[in-house]
């Protein structure tokens, strides 16, 4: 399996999910290691979703203890459908394989609050050790 960086981001800390199996692997590994996951569901054609990429990357750079995933709803429809994504962008905070928070829309301040609060409340301090084959 290969981790792909988001287009336009040089040293991205955001992992682009290419298929459902990758999603399951990343979420399971993060959960097993006690790390939260923040997932950005968007689309390449959605301007508001694209406008959040920079802020999402910035959060990933400042919170290495959290696994940040990007899911294109057109590429990984099964995961988008399973989580009930109906608008882009949609952001999920996942802990222990369960959705604990959801934000719909391009609201960078709310996403930052969610990420900052999750880092504090989960007390995680080390980055997740994701194994990629």
From Swiss-Prot:
Top-rank taxon, per record: Eukaryota
InterPro entries, per database record: Thioredoxin-like_sf, Thioredoxin_domain, Thioredoxin_H-type-like
Residue span(s) of domain Thioredoxin: 1-120
Pfam families tied to this protein: Thioredoxin
PROSITE patterns: THIOREDOXIN_2
Family to which this protein belongs: Belongs to the thioredoxin family.
The protein, known as: Thioredoxin-like protein CXXS1
